[in-house]
Swiss-Prot record:
Protein localization: Plastid, Chloroplast
A Pfam family of this chain: Intron_maturas2
Example GO molecular function: RNA binding
Record protein name field: Maturase K
Keyword RNA-binding: yes
Function: Usually encoded in the trnK tRNA gene intron. Probably assists in splicing its own and other chloroplast group II introns.
HAMAP family in the cross-refs: MatK (MF_01390)
Similarity annotation: Belongs to the intron maturase 2 family. MatK subfamily.
Keyword annotations: Chloroplast, mRNA processing, Plastid, RNA-binding, tRNA processing
Gene Ontology CC entries for this record: chloroplast
Amino acid sequence: MDKLQYELQGYLEIDRYRKQRFLYPLLFREYIYALAHDHGLNSSIFYEPTENLGYDNDNKSSSLIVKRLITRLHQQNHLTISVNDSRFVGPNRSFYSQTIPEGFAGIMEIPFSVRLVCSLERERIAKYQNLRSIHSIFPFLEDKLSHLYYVSDILIPYPIHLEILLQTLRTRIRDAPSLHLLRCFLHEHHNWNSLITSNKSISIFSKENQRLFLFLYNSHVYECESVLVFLRKQSSYLRSISSLAFLERTHFYGKIKHLVVTPRNDSQRTLPLWFFKEPLMHYVRYQGKSIMASRCTNLLMXKWKYYLVNFWQCHFHLWSQPGRIHINELSNHSFYFLGYLSGVRLTPWVIRSQMLENSFMIDTAIKRFDTIVPIFPLIGSLVKAKFCNVSGYPISKSVWADSSDSDIIGRFGWICRNLSHYHSGSSKKHSLCRIKYILRLSCARTLARKHKSTVRAICKRLGPKLLEEFLTEEHEIVSFILRRTRLRNERIWYLDIIRINGLVPHS
């Protein structure tokens, strides 16, 4: 066990001799701010593009402002100034709170981006700019999940205090002035501790310093997930065997499949170590959460859960409650994933087998990955947006009644198209049809409220125009490509659904 801990510590220390010690002087280089503003250094391979998360790219960086900033940095030692100093507030507050963190974030990305590019080039991975975690989610759901037994839904823990985040970052970057400046930026945002402990998406961060917060969040997640790579490499050394002598006879044949003998060295071959062979564990991260799925038993899944919780608490001082990590058996329970109720169902099939003159009817069951649109959370979102009441009865959107008819119809149609686009991966579309019906009738009631008329009169006057706005454009394109398939029951996944539907509750 001590040897394993030593190897883990050595793994976590890999590449730390390459720590960047002189990042702070780059703040005095004008080209750094140009690169940061243009999102250079291939920053899109480190995390999702910030423009997709609401980052404002319309404000052009002025070279004159940057030169004035560098001059002030030379004249004043901001690292010794309190955050509450008057020079940090007042008319120049936005100047300091946006320009400096933007350039600072670009500087902090340098060691991570260089390390990532080198590792990808070493593995000979081409077109790595297009790599996204979203690209691996849907093939995993379709190809792997139906063959697994248990799944664990995990909320990635957040640091309870920003100093813990800085200590974690200090293991990768040894530059005291830069880290002290980062501490000033974080203390300037008094609501940082409330942001890192909330369950909302990273996109809730203020737009002015969003790139810096995205970098900090991704570096934090990178450290939390580093142990998973180490454990995967360790488990690859275990070798499966056909038979073994085992003293305990309880559930003998069930346990014999998960046993392996690993000799320590040549002199200790007579004293083998007995391990349970850990089956392959699948890990997928999305929107601040992650799932772990495997073919292993419930006992081994529970061991994984408590190991991760204890590791996060002891190594990173991250508080995670074991009771909030649920282990579900896929054949009996569904889990909430990306706005879907997902699970594995046994689908009965009747197979006709012909052998010479005799035919046989064979009843069998095939595991099938199933995704269902949850109706009640979506209706709850519609109630919150005031499209219907708690019973699902459509009501008029009074705040839109002053807009033009085309604007009202366009807004409702846009919501319906996004819903159809997002939930195109559903196995059954009945719940989605009900939601679209509520929105269509709510649109008609809004128009009737505006014209002081009835819903029947509005539908008769607009005719097909009201219905056409609620048809999805991509459905027509896909139906042209896949003419021979039944699109009603076909799952079609789109890679941009994470940021499409604001009505989907992700908590």
